[in-house]
Amino acid sequence: MTSGPKNIAILGSTGSIGRSTLDVVRACCDRLRIVGITGHANLELLSRQAQEFQPAVTVVSDPQKAATFQLAGCPETTVLSGQAGICELVTREDVDLVVSAIVGSAGLRGTWAAIEAGKTIALANKETLVTAGPLVMQLASDCGVDILPVDSEHSAIFQALKSGRGKEVSRVVLTASGGPFRNHSAERLGDVTIEDALAHPTWDMGPKITVDSATMMNKALEIIEARWLFGLSIDKIDVVVHPQSIVHSMVEYCDGSILAQMSPPDMKLPIQYAMSYPERWEGPAEKIDLTQAFHCEFHPPDYERFPALLLGREVAERGGSCGAVLNAANESAVAGFLAGRLKFTEIVAACRDVLNYHD
């Protein structure tokens, strides 16, 4: 690693996680330096980010858009395009850590190249482990690479696991807000509109992840991610609904102790921890005021109304190519819903049908 500030490349800097990452960099500018950023569709924002941070490399991942992309005010910035450009960025010698924040399976190739190059990975792209978990974790082991979770739930588990040994873990408990429809009946779920699904009560996320949260497919994918990231069997992974999103996940040990990580629902904290690890820094994330009364509820999930959770458990247990199949089916189904071709309840039903046909 270079001396001085840690050099960061952000894959997906224009998305929700990417923007929050840059908020952390602004607050920790003496410790972090942006070497490269990538964007796909929001090129106006990508230009503004490049002008502010003056990275060595800016990548437009859509080659067609890259052909007409003009970047003013950045004389020292090289503009690259496509997946090849992403791979060139993450393999630069001066990159210390890669924030993998491209949404969906599109994030796998750049993350894979970064691991092969020996870069520390701050992983926000859960689809990397959903689609290729055993392969990615084996590659990281072979290359001596740390994969540090950015998902708030997996960051919480990662931190709580530091307090014990693997054989002492009874289970990990992923918390879920339950999404905007946690109190909806099955009949009301059939009438959910696109606008309804995009109105998440707690987190500010992009449209695909927001829909995943509403169907609870996001939590299903997190079950699979936890399976591979922490090397856990499926019987040691549980989910509870926690609407306040203050307890981000828990680890229960064999003596009955439960260790939880708590903070307001602000993605800047797990992002910063992944970039500061193994240290902790002052940062921009909101803090809990323990002098103000608050309450925390925990409820068992309803598998009948939210069957995506069952798909997550099934895929985590089956392994093989099932994760890639589920992820592809879900990406297609969510796109169909957002385009008005599928009803909300048909998203998970379509995924179920695809898995049924998968050998």
Map each language-model feature to its residues:
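Catalytic, metal-anchored helix/loop core of enzyme active sites in primary metabolism
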Residues: 1-359
